[in-house]
Amino acid sequence: MSSTNKKIAIIGAGVAGLLAAVTAADRGAKVMLFEKMPKVGLKMGITGKGRCNLTNSAPIMDFIGNTPGNGKFLYSAYEAFSNIDLLELLHGYGLVTKVERGGRVFPASDDAQEVRHLFMRLLKEKKVELHLEEPVSHIVVIDGRAKGVVTKKGRYDADAVILTTGGASYPRTGSTGDGYRMAGEIGHKITTIRPALIPLVTKESWPKDLQGLSLKNVTLSLSAGGRRKAEEFGEMLFTHFGITGPIVLSLSDKASLWLSQGHPVEATLDLKPALTQEILDKRVLRDLEKHHLKQMSGALVELLPHRMIDVVLSLAGIPRDLPVSELKKAQRASLVQTMKSMKLTITGTRPIEEAIVTAGGISVKEVNPSTMESKKVAGLYFAGEVLDIHAFTGGYNLQAAFSTGHLAAESAAGRDA
């Protein structure tokens, strides 16, 4: 542990800000942590459906691949503080973790509040000066160097400032985009803000009829301007406004981008991706022969979830009360085609306030990836979602926040003012 005696102001007590505060204090800096909300780590408390998906157990190179938003910018941050380093740190402070499907790492307690309380304890132990309900209005810059912050209570001088205010999603946790304004005021470019990892809204109303129905082992593909662009296999969920669930969230970043560019976006749902059209036709024929005395609505119970049957028949143009014995070959072909290719028109995303993460932010071209320091203002550092970085679900976003927070704090505490 070094003793820098530096004074560091950190704006925002989310994931990145909390680890930055702990890291800087460990390096001997005097840390002032400013948070506009009454509590620290509020977004941390709701991540992973309240369980806190801390990170992923995947090799660190997989993190780059799972970060469509400027993943390569994070090489140095991950090298300085990897998922292994994070877990070593947390385990050392007594947190017990577990690994679940897809390498997702959670607290063994399944309680995000345990992680939040751990950081609250560390702030106290490391004598971090915590300023709750004290939003920063702007960053003080003198002769091209960050020299402090201003709040409603006055000016606080500092040798370095770390901006960790988060994105624009989940505003009730304090993420309202304040950091974009502050960075923009001192000359930083803010790339267009849009939602990422967000449910999608459909033009068609039939998803509403299936509200609450979850599908597993299906394929959803997206096309923009008539060309297929992306595809995911896994689980999804119908809602009153459209579709959500893991594969929808993974594809939503691309859908959000294409919609913002004015491209028409269409989704295609394959209910039976493991079967070719020919094999599925044989399977349908077998089931129809088995249930030849029934109506069509009762003949597909072994092929489709009960609630899907009427929707699929309607889209295929087949009356639900049609006797199986009267089904024409062309109608059967339409049924098979519908199951392999259910079309949905994507008209938009849910509001950015509902996004799991925000795409866009402070341009990484103006930030040194080796230190997280601004290329425009000396002594100013950035970390977390305020930067133009975003990743898929699975613990990748929190690790990016932890890693950039750690690197920013090490750089700020270890350099001469």
Residue ranges and their predicted role:
Residues 38-46, 54, 60-61, 189-194, ...:
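An anion/pyrophosphate-binding glycine-rich loop and adjacent beta-alpha core
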